[in-house]
């Protein structure tokens, strides 16, 4: 909720972006983020135009109804409009390497994203959460812990509500999930508490190598806020800057860990600064990777001063997010689990590692340029078979062939039917695609719903 206009707030930080009422702003890319950006700019007295390479981008009808006077450029980018702009607010779905964006930047146009607009106006502490995997779960956990502790927290960003729509004078805390794409185009944002949960290859179609992807994630640690570091991940641990305040979490029990998993009175417990918090088997979300997520959430919640009993209550009751290790059905002694959000190799490995017994894996889709070879060790240990679909299913097949039996299919119906045919009592059929969904589906949610509906139809 944007409750002030720029002329009513002389201390507003738009000057940091060189923005004033004479600025010629183009919002590049519509969708949820672009629409929220237009709403924010207009509320604060700025004129803007919208440009999108798609003829019918998401949010178009809402934009036309709410702001019929905003100029629209759909289809090919308008070079003349770009040449006249002073500022480009680029939505995260667009690569900064696009020729038109590079040319604008070369000509002195200020290029940034919604995160820097947020940084100009935020007036309450901010928690920033990023990582290859687990960030939505940790963001949700921290938001629920804040609520349980009686803190008015606004939760969103890359998850749910766009961050500019969260801005509200009543908010006592902001909890943001941030993607590498949001971070890479920010120069101003600094969080009070920030974490990188883990680094594994993702979006390799947008980054030349893993180091570049990790560098984009590292930007969440700009400023002097508290660093929450996953000590089990060497790439994350190496992000520590001497002199910065930091706490560390991990699934080991080393002295360097502030938040850890350790045995106490014969059980595995989550420890917070050496104090037993709750038994690991009482954390409702299952999987070893989710214990790491729980520790990260506790570390952040501690930094925010939340009551620990509030944290424990959330960990005992939070069932997890849809399409993330979500139980669908037990049929003939076989469990069917939907982890459609496992859109990269690291997430697939984490899902497999957290399951007991043999697994029939359904994988494939848009691999985003990933190297699937790191699947081999866990596949050899865990898989009874792999059922492969989608555009890059053949690439996974090439990697796993000779390691485990593989089956190639075209549709989710064929995939579930094939998996049911090879699964044995006590096995798990797991949808953990290691790929994005856009080659066959609108998004990972639609893919997960298709899996769940197909499983139930075959019951």
Swiss-Prot record:
The keyword Nuclease does not apply. Its EC number is 6.3.2.9. GO terms for molecular function: ATP binding; UDP-N-acetylmuramoylalanine-D-glutamate ligase activity. ATP binds at residues 131-137. InterPro entries: Mur-like_cat_sf, Mur_ligase_C, Mur_ligase_C_dom_sf, Mur_ligase_cen, MurD. It comes from the Bacteria. GO terms for biological process: cell division; cell wall organization; peptidoglycan biosynthetic process; regulation of cell shape. One of its GO terms (cellular component) is cytoplasm. Pfam families: Mur_ligase_C, Mur_ligase_M, MurD-like_N. Its main location: cytoplasm. Gene3D superfamilies: Mur ligase, C-terminal domain, Mur-like, catalytic domain, NAD(P)-binding Rossmann-like Domain. Pathway: Cell wall biogenesis; peptidoglycan biosynthesis. It is an enzyme of class 6 (ligase). It is found in: Cytoplasm. NCBIfam families: murD (TIGR01087). Cell wall formation. Catalyzes the addition of glutamate to the nucleotide precursor UDP-N-acetylmuramoyl-L-alanine (UMA). This is UDP-N-acetylmuramoylalanine--D-glutamate ligase. It comes from Methylococcus capsulatus (strain ATCC 33009 / NCIMB 11132 / Bath). The lineage of its organism: Bacteria, Pseudomonadati, Pseudomonadota, Gammaproteobacteria, Methylococcales.
């Amino acid at each position: 909720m944007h409750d002030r206009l720029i002329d009513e707030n002389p201390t507003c930080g738009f000057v940091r972006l060189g923005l004033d009422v004479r600025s010629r702003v183009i919002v590049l890319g519509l969708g949820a983020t672009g629409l929220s950006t237009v709403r924010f700019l207009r509320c604060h007295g700025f004129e803007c135009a919208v440009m999108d390479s798609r003829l019918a981008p998401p949010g178009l009808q809402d934009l036309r109804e709410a702001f019929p006077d905003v100029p629209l450029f759909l289809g090919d980018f308008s070079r003349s409009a770009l040449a006249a702009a002073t500022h480009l607010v680029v939505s995260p779905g667009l690569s900064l390497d696009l020729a038109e964006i590079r040319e604008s930047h070369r000509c002195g146009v200020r290029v940034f994203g919604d995160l820097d607009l947020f940084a100009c106006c935020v007036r309450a502490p901010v928690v920033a959460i990023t990582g290859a995997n687990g960030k939505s779960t940790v963001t949700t956990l921290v938001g629920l812990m804040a609520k349980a502790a009686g803190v008015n927290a606004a939760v969103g960003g890359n998850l749910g509500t766009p961050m500019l729509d969260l801005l509200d004078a009543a908010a006592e805390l902001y909890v943001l999930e941030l993607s590498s794409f949001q971070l890479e185009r920010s120069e101003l944002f600094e969080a009070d508490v920030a974490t990188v949960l883990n680094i594994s290859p993702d979006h390799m179609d947008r980054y030349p190598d893993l180091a570049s992807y990790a560098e984009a994630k590292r930007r969440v640690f700009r400023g002097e806020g508290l660093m929450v570091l996953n000590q089990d991940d060497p790439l994350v641990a190496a992000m520590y800057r001497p002199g910065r305040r930091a706490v560390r979490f991990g699934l080991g029990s080393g002295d360097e860990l502030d938040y850890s998993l350790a045995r106490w009175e014969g059980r595995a417990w989550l420890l917070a600064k050496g104090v037993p918090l709750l038994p690991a088997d009482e954390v409702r979300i299952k999987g070893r990777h989710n214990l790491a997520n729980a520790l990260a959430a506790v570390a952040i919640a501690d930094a925010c001063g939340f009551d620990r009993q509030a944290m424990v209550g959330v960990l005992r009751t939070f069932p997890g997010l849809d399409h993330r290790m979500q139980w669908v059905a037990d049929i003939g002694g076989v469990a069917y689990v939907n982890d459609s959000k496992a859109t990269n190799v690291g997430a697939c490995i984490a899902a497999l590692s957290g399951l007991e017994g043999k697994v029939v894996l359904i994988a494939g889709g848009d691999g985003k340029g990933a190297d699937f070879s790191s699947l081999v060790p866990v596949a050899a240990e865990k898989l009874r078979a792999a059922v492969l679909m989608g555009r890059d299913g053949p690439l996974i097949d090439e990697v796993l062939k000779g390691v485990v039996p593989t089956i190639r299919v075209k549709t989710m119906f064929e995939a579930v039917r094939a998996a049911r045919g090879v699964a044995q009592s006590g096995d798990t059929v797991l949808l953990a695609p290691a790929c994005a969904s856009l080659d066959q589906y609108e998004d990972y949610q639609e893919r997960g719903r298709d899996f769940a509906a197909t499983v139930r139809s075959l019951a």
